[in-house]
Amino acid sequence: MKTYTAKPETVQRDWFVVDAAGQTLGRLATEIARRLRGKHKPEYTPHVDTGDYIVVINAEQVRVTGAKTTDKMYYHHSGFPGGIKSINFEKLIAKAPERVIETAVKGMLPKNPLGRDMYRKLKVYKGANHPHTAQQPQELKI
């Protein structure tokens, strides 16, 4: 029996909608990253993007445990000397709640062109509305 290798043109991709309300950030992000990679499918192939599209709603209602609301820091750099910027979880969730989930999931995906393609299939929105109703996403319980 030959080992099956998925072909990019034959991969069946589904759309799923995930409600982040009351979910723990890390546990939610690991399951989303797993589904974006396609590891939940029997035809998973490491060098082919076999993952599904994931739409996350209610991003502002995601939660973290312990004192991470004030202690968890997000860093970025302007590119200039001394240009390191930081913001904590509490301020970032108020300013741009989508970035919290996007950052957590992006860190769990491969750091290569294939990982960037997987990341593009993630759509995160604050609030319960999203513009992907035409794709008829199925609800995914995590």
Swiss-Prot record:
SUPFAM superfamilies, per the entry: Ribosomal protein L13 (SSF52161)
GO terms under biological process: negative regulation of translation; translation
Entry keywords, A to Z: Ribonucleoprotein, Ribosomal protein
Cellular component GO terms held in the UniProt record: cytosolic large ribosomal subunit
Domain of life from the UniProt record: Bacteria
Protein's UniProt keywords contain DNA damage: no
GO molecular-function terms, A-Z: mRNA binding; structural constituent of ribosome
Keyword Ribonucleoprotein belongs to the record: yes
InterPro entries associated with the record: Ribosomal_uL13, Ribosomal_uL13_bac-type, Ribosomal_uL13_CS, Ribosomal_uL13_sf
Oligomeric and partner information: Part of the 50S ribosomal subunit.
Family statement: Belongs to the universal ribosomal protein uL13 family.
HAMAP family according to UniProt: Ribosomal_uL13
Name listed for the protein in its UniProt record: Large ribosomal subunit protein uL13
Gene that specifies this protein: rplM
